Regions:
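Amphipathic alpha-helical interaction surfaces in cytosolic regulatory modules
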Residues: 42-46, 50-99
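Short, conserved, surface-exposed binding loops centered on an aromatic residue
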Residues: 8-11, 38-42
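STAS-typified acidic loop motif
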Residues: 5-33
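Hydrophobic "anchor" residues on beta-strands that sit immediately upstream
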Residues: 15, 47-49, 104
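Short acidic-hydrophobic, aromatic-tinged amphipathic segments that line or gate anion-handling sites
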Residues: 101-112
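Intrinsically disordered or compositionally simple regulatory linkers and C-terminal tails
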Residues: 1-2, 118-119
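Expand to "…catalyze enediolate/carbanion chemistry for C-C bond making/breaking, isomerization
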Residues: 32-41, 77, 110
Length: 119
């Protein structure tokens, strides 16, 4: 799968939005992590949103990668928000003990944008 088509990283002012649009392989997850960390460093980013709205299920590698990715981005400074966690994804993350300490969650992208403006 082409990462460019699968995982666009959009910048809107000081916000980065990553919308997953399909299943990613392990190499794609690693590239996404590198690309997002590079984009955070390019310019001052206040918020980074990982939108999982269309992801129904994640394997253990993807769950661990999301935890690592969100922690790495947050350590770089931006407030990290994970949006659109579907029931199957939430179940997998809980079963694997994957938690997102210090990371905000939102029902969907609109809710994430509201959190950025209204806290």
């Amino acid at each position: 799968m082409s990462l460019t088509a699968a995982v666009p990283i959009l910048r809107q002012g000081d916000i980065l939005i990553v919308t997953l649009q399909g299943d990613l392989g392990d190499a794609d997850w690693a590239k996404l992590t590198d690309d997002l960390l590079d984009r955070v460093a390019e310019r001052r980013t206040r918020f980074a949103v990982l939108d999982l709205s269309v992801v129904d299920v994640l394997d253990s590698f993807a769950c661990r990668t999301i935890v690592g990715l969100t922690n790495m981005v947050a350590l770089r400074g931006p407030t990290m928000i994970v949006a659109g966690i579907q029931p199957g994804v939430a179940f997998a993350m809980v079963q694997l003990g994957a938690t997102l300490p210090g990371v905000s969650t939102a029902l969907d992208l609109d809710h994430a944008l509201a959190l950025m403006t209204h806290g």
